[in-house]
């Protein structure tokens, strides 16, 4: 998941500048009779190393590489629970019954998560932030919670407490004290978004 290490200054700082580090390498493509140059662009986000590898002239399109990494950091800033100023953190502080507008990213992620929650009969659930904290998976240490621990009770968790208006792009909590955690979907959502920027006919 998107653990707190991703926001530590020594881990989350971008390499050198906002422009990704260029690392030339050489490889062999089976369809080519000669070696081709591969270029790797690396940055860190969500406590993970991210890399874009492009061949030949495609690797020279630095504006699109920068755009892809900028999109990654933008998504992290919205979905991480390890920054008080993130969008999801603001939703987790929201009083129940108060409806607020949310960004297109949150609409899309929450819409997908609601569908998966319904498809799995509630087994897939991102409204389990309280439970994650009770188990010590937020900032540690990990430990089995007491059966009576407030954060593991049904009333403290569950997408059934989420009211998402897709048409109006708004959100409200139906119950107080429930929290979102996108640790299970954040990286995949970011990969899809970055691939959309780099896909044919633009680069790949």
Stretch-by-stretch model annotation:
Residues 190:
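Residue-level recognition of oxygen-bearing side chains
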Residues 3-183, 193-203:
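A contiguous, well-ordered beta/alpha segment that forms the leading edge of an enzyme domain
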């Amino acid at each position: 998941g998107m653990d707190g290490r991703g926001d530590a200054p020594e881990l989350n700082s971008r390499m050198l500048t906002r422009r990704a580090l260029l690392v030339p390498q050489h490889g062999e493509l089976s369809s080519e009779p000669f070696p081709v140059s591969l270029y790797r662009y690396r940055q860190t986000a969500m406590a993970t190393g991210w890399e874009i590898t492009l061949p030949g002239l495609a690797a020279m399109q630095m504006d699109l590489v920068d755009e892809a990494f900028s999109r990654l950091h933008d998504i992290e800033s919205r979905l991480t629970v390890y920054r008080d100023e993130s969008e999801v953190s603001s939703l987790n502080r929201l009083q129940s019954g108060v409806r607020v507008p949310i960004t297109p990213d949150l609409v899309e992620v929450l819409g997908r998560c609601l569908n998966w929650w319904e498809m799995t009969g509630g087994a897939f659930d991102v409204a389990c932030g309280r439970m994650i904290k009770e188990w010590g998976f937020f900032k540690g240490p990990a430990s089995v919670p007491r059966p009576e621990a407030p954060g593991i009770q049904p009333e403290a968790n569950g997408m059934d407490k989420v009211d998402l208006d897709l048409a109006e792009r708004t959100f409200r909590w139906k119950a107080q004290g429930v929290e979102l955690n996108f640790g299970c979907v954040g990286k995949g959502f970011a990969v899809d978004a970055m691939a959309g920027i780099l896909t044919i006919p633009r680069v790949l």
